[in-house]
Amino acid sequence: MSRVLVTGAYGFLGRYVVRELLAHGYEVVAFGRKRDKLEALRADGAEAAELFVGDFCRQEDITAAAKGVDFVIHAGALSTVWGKRSDFMETNVRGTQRVIRACKQNKVERLVFVSSPSIYAGKCDRLNIRETDCDASNCLNYYIESKILAEKVLREQRGVPCVIIRPRGLFGVGDSSIIPRLIKANRRSGIPLFRGGHNLVDITCVENAALALRLAVESEAAVGQVYNITNGEPQEFRA
């Protein structure tokens, strides 16, 4: 069975990706910077995963981790809206360049990159968004800018077949970000409901995003493509 390296393996999405791959017979190398969090991942349904402690911003780490690997899912990123531009560029852009270099050196069959639909964000409503509806000059924040630049790096490189996945608004068991923060804020002071809360949001069950990433590994037709991933069930924000 094929061997897959997953960066960002102990992140919210990464944990589900590791378990999804293991459940379908893949050998998985779970890559991350903190051994204790990788060990916690292994204890939480990923017993068969091989652990690799490292930083994909260090070329020697990611190159060593990719040795003998058939596929790489690059889910690791600096994914906050706060911070210095230099940190986003180092992690999300130059880090991705190092992952690509590691894939080339190890002759990896395919790289699946986890991007973000945040790149579509603007100061107006966006509905029925297609994968091509991206403004390459969008600099609304450093995270968005870094993801756009990382995608540009992937499109312009040669030698590593790539797939780009943009999963929207993940939720599920183990989420410590979007939904818990909204609940906490609402309990503390209430959340302002613009347009009475009738504005639409599209969120995605994390299991569906993990499935999409596995299918991106398996499908030859996916190579060179970009995919928005959502549940396809827009809901009013107040719901």
What are these regions (language model features)?
Residues L140-N141, R168-S176, G196-V206, E233:
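Glycine-rich "substrate-gating" loop/helix at the edge of Rossmann-like oxidoreductase active sites
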Residues E50-R94, A102, G122:
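NAD(P)H-binding glycine-rich loop region in Rossmannoid oxidoreductase-like domains
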Residues F31-R35, D55-F56:
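N-terminal Rossmann-fold cofactor-binding loop
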Residues N138-V163:
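Active-site Tyr-X1-5-Lys
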Residues A121, V160-R181:
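Flexible, glycine-rich beta-alpha linker
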Residues I183-I191, N199-Q235:
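Alpha-helical substrate-binding/gating segment
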Residues R94, R98-Y142:
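Conserved Rossmann-fold NAD(P)-dependent oxidoreductase catalytic core, especially the SDR/UDP-sugar
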Residues V4-H24:
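N-terminal Rossmann NAD(P)H-binding glycine-rich loop of SDR-like oxidoreductase domains
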